[in-house]
Amino acid sequence: MALTQLQSDILRCLAKNRSETSYLAGGLMLNKNWKRRSDDIDIFHDTDEEVTGAADADLAALDAAGFKTHKDVIIYGCVDATVSNGNSSTIIQWFAETKRRFFPLVRDEEWGARLHLADLAVNKILAASGRSKARDIADLVAIAQHYCPLGPLVLAAAGKPPNFSPKRTIDEIRRHILGIPAEEFAAVKGLPVDWTAEFIREQALQLIEQAEKYIMAAPADLLGILTVDKQSIPIELVDGKRGNAILRKATDEPEVMPSPPEFNVVEWGSTRP
């Protein structure tokens, strides 16, 4: 597990504060069962108005539990804070994010509410196309190695802001792969020892080339659609044949929480946050 002990303790402390509109996301959740370590905890909210109140409630809970907290950034729709236990520290970021997603949120006793792994993977495609960060490229390699091919994610990403075409998404990711210096890849924490800058770059370029071939051959009606199997894992359609594939479209509408077998899911109710 990529979380530090401090991050795990913080998440357990704050699990009771998570809800349908305040949930865990970002690189920490994507990599929670993989190798890469993240320096921050991302907590997403559906609206800017919710952010400050959620941050205050979380910080109050952490203070009561004996953690040391300090607000570093306080602006409308965004709060950053450093949290420590005397031996180590991490950053928590609260901010607003579009609630348009392909799956309902998932909730369990340990983590609170979080984005479904498929949505985390689609969001990583969006991040890798929108900014030049070595950790995003490393995460693409990890997604392909541990979870699913990138092609279906690229097609699905067209259904979320900024609604780039799949081809533009591919082009932007490729540009970022080639433009990131080797030392930035080397600075990414927790990666396997054989994940050198050269390895990550070569793997990412191969994966993007494969994804490009897939999107160029995919039926036009899959634009903005996520194709998944019965286990809700994104899949490629072979020769355009849909078979038992499930097609999901991103939506803003609230949905009932699912109960994936890997989670001990609890019901929402008046006694739960």
Predicted regions mapped to residue ranges:
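Compositionally biased terminal segments of proteins
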Residues: 1-273
